[in-house]
């Protein structure tokens, strides 16, 4: 559902994120590079007939090693959260990437399908394990969820971080266990 994803705006820059819930509250999970070093972010939920905007949302936690961020949502925000998956991801598994990469200068909703091409991609430069997948992602998709279907619902298996521009159909995702 479009209401479950969002676009975070920072000085005219957009990115994606997803609502998650913990024992400590409700947050937007995204990439650190989406919010940069800001202490607050404006979160917008682009719904079918309206856009909900929450300003001055506090950046609660930042992981520079994994390029992840949690932004607090106000109590007045009732957008549903998506559950984090505990399933072990395997090569060949079907996945869905979602986000708001934008089209014609405006954020636009995008859902793409693909499969896991390397469940344990290791990149020497940053000594991090990623999920490599074939679902198309574009600039602005950063911070959006990589999802698997579990029964009638979807669960988050990772946070889309970047695409390999030097190869076709290569998306790079931070696994949910890094959260």
Question: Where are the predicted features?
Answer:
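Short Gly/Pro-enriched turn/cap motifs at secondary-structure boundaries
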Residues: 7-9, 59-61, 134-138
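A residue-level detector for short acidic-glycine micro-motifs
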Residues: 19-21, 59-61, 99, 118-120, ...
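A conserved glycine-rich beta-strand in the N-terminal activation segment of trypsin-fold
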Residues: 2-28, 53-56, 111, 143, ...
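Catalytic nucleophile loop of clan PA
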Residues: 18, 136-160
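Catalytic-histidine neighborhood of serine endopeptidases
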Residues: 20-66, 73-76
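Flexible, gly/ser-rich surface segments that form the specificity/activation loops bordering the active-site cleft
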Residues: 79-131, 136-142, 162-171
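Short beta->alpha transition motifs characteristic of CBS
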Residues: 30-36, 99-101, 157-166, 176
